[in-house]
């Protein structure tokens, strides 16, 4: 009797675990017009699309430079230490001096304004976006929504937009690019209401594209933008024609189990050439433990650290620069720059300046807290997406997952590329490689839809 009971319990437990690991829940019920603006929804919604120009105004610049000039003396690094304890404050001094003396605010604003900028109100929030239409004839134009992550903005894409909107030999299509600032980032308005998580941002971005007249479109995204885009592909598969991501990630429970099981026989779990990107797991966990302190703070107490970062441009620069450096090359802690040399300093200071002038560091960091606060996020994570997906994995991306794990979430992974260089801010660091992969991925998306069309036609 006892052995039978034990066997029955074991079988039941196994079935329960299997169900949990492989379950595909129903999508959450979402209000697709949920109001995120101040107060209650307005009776008449402003649907206008307004031209917008970026200006680094004199008052902001004067105040910023005064604060930088009056900064306190920083504590020097320990003897023999470069960036192992965080940003090298001697190096930081040179960056701040450059920001005050040599960073050309007008020139940088003019460069950003080479693209048409707009704002429109979506669900109570003014959303900023760049929209560049290609000047072409006899070439198919594919609408492409581009979404960034933290601590970035649509500025991140200023190197790739010109390449994406120009025809290239061997391709019979080009892109119309819509690069949007996530709510609370860059020039997009943040909310004063809790709950604006990546799922809800996905709804906002879908509504933005519909406002612009796109019923169907493609998406390219990284970091938090990739999370929002993945949720869009999951929830709106009839509208998202293809998803290209430079931070591919499956957050399903079975994916975590596979990651752990793969540690037992790494050569069976991942191509031997790339095994050291995730195995041995102790190295991965050591890296994540070393570099994820900011993540935990922002996911729990963003408003507290936000006080210091809002009040001090030196502190804001140090905080953002250190993370941009490590995510561009994690192996250069023994240098003063900590990895920042792989990015153009003016691009980095554009990001810091945009964050400072819009006072949006707190509203951007809150996404870390919101991303884990509501069960609807994990629910959508657990639902597979059948939208054709392309993944590109740069060398120093935060985390790498092999295709056999990615397919837990992305059932139609039509292209997967592994790059032996680059990092998290791909559009800034390796714009040519990213652009090439977007074009090649679009070829696969078009093939996927043509094949499905032939199958449908044969069945009628």
Placement of each model-derived feature along the sequence:
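Alpha/beta-hydrolase active-site loop
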Residues: 193-211
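Glycine-rich "HGGG/HGxG" loop immediately N-terminal to the catalytic nucleophile
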Residues: 105-107, 155, 182-196, 230
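Terminal signal-anchor or tail-anchor transmembrane helices
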Residues: 1-29
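C-terminal subdomain of alpha/beta-hydrolase-fold enzymes, centered on the catalytic histidine
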Residues: 13, 17, 298-460
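Non-catalytic accessory segments flanking enzyme active sites
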Residues: 60-133, 359, 363-377
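Conserved hydrolase catalytic core segment
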Residues: 3-4, 17-20, 163-174, 212-274
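Short, contiguous pre-domain boundary segments
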Residues: 36-50, 71-74
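Conserved HGGG/HGGXW glycine-rich cap/lid loop of the alpha/beta-hydrolase fold
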Residues: 137-187, 442
């Amino acid at each position: 009797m006892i052995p039978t009971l034990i066997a029955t319990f074991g079988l039941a437990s196994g079935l329960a675990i299997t169900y949990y690991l492989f379950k595909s829940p129903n999508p959450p019920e979402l209000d697709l017009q949920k109001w995120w603006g101040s107060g209650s929804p307005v009776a008449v919604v402003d649907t206008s699309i307004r031209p917008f120009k970026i200006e680094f105004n004199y008052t902001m610049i004067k105040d910023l430079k005064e604060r930088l000039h009056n900064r306190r003396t920083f504590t020097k690094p320990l003897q023999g230490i470069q960036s192992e304890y965080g940003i090298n404050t001697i190096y930081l001094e040179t960056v701040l001096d450059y920001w005050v003396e040599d960073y050309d605010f007008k020139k940088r604003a003019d460069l950003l304004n080479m693209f048409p900028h707009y704002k429109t109100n979506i669900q109570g929030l003014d959303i900023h976006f760049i929209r560049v239409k290609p000047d072409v004839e006899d070439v198919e134009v594919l609408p492409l929504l581009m979404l960034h992550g933290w601590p970035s903005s649509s500025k991140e894409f200023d190197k790739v937009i010109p390449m994406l909107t120009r025809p290239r030999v061997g391709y019979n299509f080009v892109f119309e690019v819509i690069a949007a600032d996530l709510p609370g980032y860059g020039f997009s308005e943040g909310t004063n209401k809790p709950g604006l998580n990546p799922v809800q941002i996905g709804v906002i971005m879908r509504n933005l594209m519909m406002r612009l007249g796109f019923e169907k479109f493609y998406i390219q995204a990284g970091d938090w933008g990739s999370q929002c885009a993945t949720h869009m592909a999951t929830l709106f598969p009839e509208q998202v024609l293809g998803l290209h991501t430079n931070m591919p990630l499956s957050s399903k429970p079975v994916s975590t189990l596979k990651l752990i099981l793969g540690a037992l026989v790494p050569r069976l779990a991942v191509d031997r050439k790339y095994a050291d990107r995730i195995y041995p797991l102790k190295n991965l966990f050591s890296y994540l433990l070393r570099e994820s302190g900011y993540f935990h703070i922002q996911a729990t107490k963003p408003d507290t650290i936000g006080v210091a970062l809002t009040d001090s441009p030196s502190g804001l620069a140090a905080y953002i620069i250190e993370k941009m450096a490590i995510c561009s090359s994690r192996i250069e802690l023994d240098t003063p720059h900590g990895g920042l040399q792989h990015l153009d300093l003016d691009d980095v200071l554009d990001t810091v300046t945009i964050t400072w002038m819009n006072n949006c560091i707190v509203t951007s960091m809150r996404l870390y807290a919101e991303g884990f606060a509501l069960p609807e996020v994990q629910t959508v994570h657990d639902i597979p997406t059948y939208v054709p997906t392309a993944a590109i994995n740069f060398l120093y991306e935060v985390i790498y997952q092999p295709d056999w794990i990615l397919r837990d979430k992305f059932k139609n992974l039509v292209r997967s590329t592994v790059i032996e260089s680059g990092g998290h801010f791909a559009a800034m660091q390796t714009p040519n490689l990213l652009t090439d992969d977007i074009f090649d991925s679009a070829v696969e998306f078009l093939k996927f839809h043509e094949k499905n069309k032939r199958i449908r036609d044969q069945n009628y």
